[in-house]
């Protein structure tokens, strides 16, 4: 019995206390952003706040990842204008175009079912409204790079985009 109690006591300790802690500067931090349920308040409040955090990360030399390529459809031109150069701008257009084509190839149109019934119940009326809310998570900083899905993101990049699906678990797994 004493062995069981000792084992329970040992396993009950937080794992964090067993790991070596190491200080690091905020510029070393990489954050990933993700949408929750979209409604009109997303683009007015929560995503705007995330965008302010994203801008702050860029200012201090950190990295913020804007994800969910399918959520850019209808607002990609706004992101492309923020590309640091023509290559990045064209890459933004390309990843959105590729998603739209992939969806068409299987006989669907991304605009069908978007916004979703839940989005519409929340007050969104168009895919573009949903996308405008999504891109607020990227704040106002220039887009410095576009990464393929699940590629390692460099530190000290400011705002970057990762080409991920709109499905939350898949998007988060890629980041």
Q: Residue locations for each model-derived region?
A:
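Glycine-rich phosphate/diphosphate-binding loops that line cofactor/substrate pockets in enzymes
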Residues: 20-30
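Anaerobic metallocofactor- and corrinoid-dependent redox/one-carbon enzyme cores
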Residues: 28, 33, 39-175
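Short, charged beta->alpha transition segments
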Residues: 14-20
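A short helix-breaking turn/cap at a secondary-structure junction
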Residues: 9-13
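Glycine-rich phosphate-binding loops that contact phosphosugars or nucleotide phosphates
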Residues: 2-7
């Amino acid at each position: 019995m004493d062995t069981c109690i000792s084992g329970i006591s040992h396993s009950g300790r937080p794992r964090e206390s067993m790991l070596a802690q190491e200080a690091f500067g905020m510029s070393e931090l990489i954050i990933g952003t993700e949408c929750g349920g979209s409604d009109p308040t997303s683009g007015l409040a929560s995503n705007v706040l995330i965008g302010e955090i994203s801008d702050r990360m860029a200012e201090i030399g950190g990295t913020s990842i804007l994800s969910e390529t399918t959520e850019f459809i209808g607002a990609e031109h706004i992101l492309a204008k923020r590309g640091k150069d023509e290559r990045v701008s064209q890459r933004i257009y390309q990843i959105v175009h590729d998603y739209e084509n992939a969806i068409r190839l299987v006989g669907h149109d991304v605009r069908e079912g978007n916004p979703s019934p839940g989005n519409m119940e929340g007050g969104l009326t168009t895919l573009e409204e949903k996308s405008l809310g999504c891109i607020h998570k990227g704040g106002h900083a220039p887009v410095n790079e576009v990464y393929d899905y699940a590629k390692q993101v460099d530190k000290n990049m400011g705002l970057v985009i990762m080409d991920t699906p709109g499905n939350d678990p898949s998007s988060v797994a890629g980041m």
